[in-house]
Amino acid sequence: VTTRTAKIADRTVSIGGDVWKKGSFKRGDMIDDALGNNLGHSFPKIDKLDNGVAVSIKSIKLSDKTYETAKGIYNKLRRDVDALDEFKEAADKKRNISPKDYSAKKLEIAVQDMKITAEQQRGLEMVKEYAKEKGIEISITVVK
């Protein structure tokens, strides 16, 4: 049984340029920009502040062999949830973000528009549950 990522996503963003064929760093920068990175690409741990929410944006190429299983997806995204959970404060040359600047945390997961298996969907659901236990919101965005 398969389902389209668009059916489980919270939103869809079209950026074109075959973003999913790019290398991971180039793809990450393009997706960061498209999803509203307002802290710069080198800011530690988080990518944007959005109305009091500290947001980390992560892209995951679900067509990669590593992410064929629920365990593969869960293990990768669990590390991202843990990193966001551990985030308290960070600074660069332009700004300092501390707990007074945010009241919630969110991991925004960017995925390609494709069919995924029930196994892959289970991996995403497992991550949502794990994040919920830590008080972190998960949103899934289809980027095409």
Specify the residue positions occupied by each region the protein language model found.
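Catalytic toxin/effector domains delivered as secreted proteins or via bacterial secretion systems
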Residues: T3-K144
